Amino acid sequence: MDDLMTNIEHYHVSLTTGFLPPSAPLTHLPQKYYEPWETLASSLPTRIRDGSLRHQASLIPLLETDFLVTDAEWQRAYVVLGFLSNAFIFCQYPPSERLPLSLAEPMMNVSCYLGLPCVPTYSGQTLWNHCYISEIQLPVLEQVNTLVSFTGSREESAFFGISVAIEKCGSPLIRTLLHAMAAAEAGNEKELTACLSKAMITIDSITSILPQLYGRCSPSFFYNTLRPFLEGTQDLKSAGLPNGVFFETKNGGSYQKFRGPSNAQSSLFCFIDIALGIEHNDNSFLTEMRQYMPGPHRDFLARVEAIDSVRHFISANPDASQLQEAYEGCVLALARFRQIHIRLVARYIVIPSNGTKTADQSSMGNGLSSEPVSIAGAQGTGGTKPVEFLKVIRNDVLESLQAS
């Protein structure tokens, strides 16, 4: 445990910022060589609106990734290429079956370096794609801005910013829950109780952030305007692309099929579950989502999994009433978060899906198509039925109390 705490930065995790980078993400790649990427990314909302994106993307030269040096540069490249790629594919209906060489080749190379699939993920749209408008230590939603955007809208910034604010607010849980696991390992009941009580307060603070999205990002904007750009390449059969999207490469190319970005790709909540010993009865989707987390984060979670969760110690000490109460409070706080998240998803996905607008009514891409705006219907962008999935996750959280 001491070794893990000492070398935590090796896993691109910070005791201060959690899974967010310790320094602000790059707003621009420093090498002029990559200016074609940056120029198109900066004009992305305009190019999508006027219908010129695919033409402009076809003019970009094939750029090698050899000149990317720092982790921040690789992350910035992944953000830019991820947005450009999904914008190219989904800016019009039907989606493009092919991603041109100038985007596909570097996207595959950058993704491979970062240990990610060649598709936009939670990390690329949230962890590495934000800046703080002001220097207040704990950002609220108004203080988070998106660096690369499909629409250029404050509503889009609010949608992605809510996850940034949650990650920042939840960052103290890294230290708190690692200390809790160390206390359990050492049999220190008093310290473990204190850590769990502290964790409960932090989780409740996270939960209080979720409703801030209401009024800042409308369900109509999210579902009809933003969400089409958050699709993956896996569930496109209904759009006539059963094989996914063909990524052109210098060696020919191949079809790629990956899920879209999902909050299930957040390493923070996976870490919380591991530390508290919350087991999921059907974890196949959550296990798959690990592959959509940055490689170092996956390695960190694997290290934490190798340590006994606090639940083992708590189960072995049923008469420690204060400890049991602290654990119960922590788990119930997490269940409250899951419940509020269910309500949010119902408002932003399920309800709009019952009255889906067509693209000419909702400004998907250039607004010329009459095809349904959402390929996935009431599915989440990760390919699940979101409310059903989240209810199972919430119930798994509550079941951990019965088994403790």
Curated annotation (Swiss-Prot):
Alphabetic keyword roster: Dioxygenase, Heme, Iron, Metal-binding, Oxidoreductase
Cofactor dependence: heme
Superkingdom as given in the UniProt entry: Eukaryota
Cofactor note (record): Binds 1 heme group per subunit.
Reported function: 6-hydroxytryptophan 2,3-dioxygenase; part of the fragmented gene cluster that mediates the biosynthesis of fusarochromene, a tryptophan-derived metabolite closely related to a group of mycotoxins including fusarochromanone. Within the pathway, fscD is responsible of the cleavage of the pyrrole ring of 6-hydroxytryptophan. The first step of the pathway is the epimerization of L-tryptophan to D-tryptophan in the presence of the NRPS-like tryptophan epimerase fscC. D-tryptophan is subsequently hydroxylated by the tryptophan 6-hydroxylase fscE to yield 6-hydroxytryptophan.
Protein family: Belongs to the indoleamine 2,3-dioxygenase family.
Protein name: 6-hydroxytryptophan 2,3-dioxygenase fscD
Organism: Fusarium equiseti
Gene transcribed to yield this protein: fscD
